[in-house]
Amino acid sequence: LLETTTIMRHFFITLYLLGISLFSSAQQEEKAALLITHYGSSDPQTRALTLDVVTREAQEAFPQFTVREAYISPIVRKRLAKEGVYKDSPTDALLKLRAEGYRTIYVQSTTLIEGSEMTSVRRDADKLRPFFKEIKVGNPLLYSVEDCEKVIGILTAEQPEKKEDIVYVGHGNQLPSTATYAMLDFMMKAHGLKNF
């Protein structure tokens, strides 16, 4: 379990760092923010080990930005609200940042593929773009073949025992982007990685 948690942590951190190119052009004197969007999790332990770590490490990696987080899933936000935990939607987070005087926003989602959640994040940013000087939205982790190559390198850095297999599970959808998971599997097999 600890090894899986470590792999997941590195996985999400890598997702975040792959979006770094978006943020390199920000002007330091301007009030800018980084909005990390997560699908969300209603499990406190999962949040603490993954999503909270990504948000915290984003703030450490980019101290020049105010870092905020938002949860994409309305179902997760409703469940959390019943427990007294309140998370903003991407739209709400953007509106709050605007009200606080932020004019440049960089949005990076922790979603894996260009699925319905990522489409939702892009739509929210587009809807509010006229109210900001600039909103840039980063791509999901598995956006290009090059991204998949980098992720394969990270996921396979520690090889399983010969009689062990590692299974990665991604949440698909009805969009063609679900084929990204099949592409990742094919690429792993092409690299001779039979235990993944």
Report residues per predicted region.
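A general, composition-driven signal for non-globular sequence regions
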Residues: E3-T4, S21, K133, K189
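Active-site-proximal alpha-helix that buttresses catalytic centers in soluble enzyme cores
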Residues: Q27-F196
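Positively charged n-region of N-terminal signal peptides that target proteins for export
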Residues: E3-F11
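Hydrophobic h-region of N-terminal signal peptides that target proteins for export
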Residues: F12, Y16-S25
